[in-house]
Amino acid sequence: MLVDLRMRSAALGALFCTMALAAPAAAIELPTAQARAELLDTLEREALYRDRVDWPEMRARLSAAQGNPEKIRDVLKEAIGRSSGGHGAWLSVERMRSEATRSGRATAPAAITASDATAAAQSPALDPRIGQVEIGGFSVVPGPAVVQQMQERAARWQAIIRDQDTGKRCGWIVDLRGNTGGNMWPMLLGMAPLLRITKEGEETVGSFATAKDPSPWRSTPSGMRLGTRVIVDLGTPGYRLKHPGVPVAVLTGPRTASAGEATVLALRGRPQTRSFGEPTAGVSTANVVRPLVDGSALVLTTSVMRDRNGRGDGLKITPDQHTRSDAATVAAAQAWLLAQPACAGR
């Protein structure tokens, strides 16, 4: 899941799932000596948890490991892991190339624009008054079509909601249990019909918290902004529910990670919203990509995600109601929705 290096926006870069530093045992890939020095300098200067590392000691260990690829790899992996809380990574040139190829196949335009009628089908266990949308992980392919990919994916999720919104839905389930991360912006825009509670204007639904002022995530009727910067926009107002502001149940689990956790936080604090399931993966922090001198890249963890009320610590997000099995989670979410005034009177 490679984004435009130099992160034409720390915004477009969004959030990455954890990636392993280690290459297959047959061929250990490493940054060049110059890139290794640059990598450590960048971590010491910018990494979110940089104070957790003794940098002189780390450099001494790296120097002592010269000539031993396995030890070099292990030192770099430890430096990145400790300073990022386990969320950062080093990406070799080959890794980036293969990720781009894989993502390109997974997000081909035909797949993005295809009908999602089958994906939007109601679960047999759900009351017909309850709508449901699954927001899964999604990564963009770097290049000039990044914005188009985000627009198309967001429009697809909004269409899933629109196709179910017959006017008879009194509550909705947003299923994030399988959302392993990627790019958060199309996720937030895709579920905007459920996320937003007003028709006009901007709504702050979360933020990135750094040592400086927080950078708010802002939902508009047609797009998403980071502060005042437009990240993705449909060009025209997106879909609006027939009954805006209805109750929403959010499903989470241990696979809900990174951008998936950003999506959880964007919904947390929304009126008439409650979460169910198990705690998330615990990487509710934001990454940007820094290119290194040898063409490889550092996925650098720089900030903590927070909800619309300024709450967030970069760790696991605990649901409001802990349920263990998938069936129990869906049942608890449905029971809560049907007990709300919007459903109880129908």
At which residue positions do the language-model features occur?
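Terminal targeting/pro-maturation regions of precursor/exported proteins
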Residues: 26-173, 177-178, 345-346
